Amino acid sequence: MEAGPVSAVVGRFAPSPSGRLHLGNLACSLLAWLSAKSRGGRIVLRIEDLDAERCPRKYADQLEEDLGWLGLFWDEGGSKGGPHEPYYQSECSGIYTESYKKLEAMGLVYPCFCSRSQLHAASAPHTSDGNVIYPGTCRGLTAEEIAEKRKKKAPAYRLMVPDENITFTDGCMGEYAENLLRDCGDFYLRRADGVFAYQLAVVVDDARMGVTEVVRGADLLSSTARQLYLYRLLGLPAPKFAHCPLLLASDGRRLSKRDGDQSLENLRARYTAEDIVGRLAYAYGLQEEPAPRTPESLIKDFSWDKVPKKDICLPEGLFE
């Protein structure tokens, strides 16, 4: 697999269509759009529906309609198509297999028979995004042990990582460093049911689509070291990263798709698109009052220097 052609700045929307968009998703999408468009860049829409059963196509269609309603238009991808198809991860298994086999040929992939409950029972430490840091239980299994375990259970597959520090400068959060072995651990490349893992899929897709900048939530900051390692192993150009602060409910809870009152489905009944965009711009420091705005009108006001570095609690009454 070769990286796609790069022309200036290429950002992306990469939502998982497992439900309707909420304010946190919208904020990241707005910042990604503004970051690219403020420098004359393009936006790719990729639908991250790796787990197709949890991500019915109707949600992807609704997601496109919602983004368009807000004025967050993209240049290629989704149902619009373009030169880097497919744009739905559920259609990319063959592409991921090619990169997976390269890693396998390096001797870095091994089968893992551990269940999530076993790892939690072992009190393994957790990464900052809540995942268990794998203690390497299956890393040294012999061929005989693997064959015996296969009789009882299909394995998932992990990538072996070195004891190495990965450092980078985040466009929003600044300097960041993680040790691959201590802070991340060997991580999944493929589930036992054959579905490829997020870490591999996003690296392969961002490279082949020519993405030069990844803007996403700060909850994914700790995924970046693993992804930079994959870019290096696969010989692919890595994009720049900017992780925006998470949007929290006024009581400090992290917003999720379960927060129906903050879903775009409900917000559209109470606010115009310009109302929502303007209020989000205010929450993220792009304007001094929550006045209605279009994304286009915010381009001249955008700067990462204005965006807070810490998670943002929605001001009481901003979205009633």
Where in this protein do the model-derived segments appear?
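N-terminal Rossmann-like or analogous alpha/beta NTP/dinucleotide-binding catalytic cores
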Residues: 2-123, 127, 218-219, 223-236, ...
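Structural motif
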Residues: 21-23, 193, 270-271
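Alpha-helix initiation and N-capping motif
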Residues: 60, 93, 116-119, 131, ...
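A short, terminal or domain-edge coil/loop segment
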Residues: 68, 98-109, 164-177, 291-310
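Short secondary-structure transition/capping segments
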Residues: 87-102, 126-132, 155-163, 283-298
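Alpha-helix boundary recognition
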Residues: 101-105, 207, 268, 281
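Active-site cores that bind ATP or allylic diphosphates and position pyrophosphate for catalysis
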Residues: 117-256, 263-267, 319-320
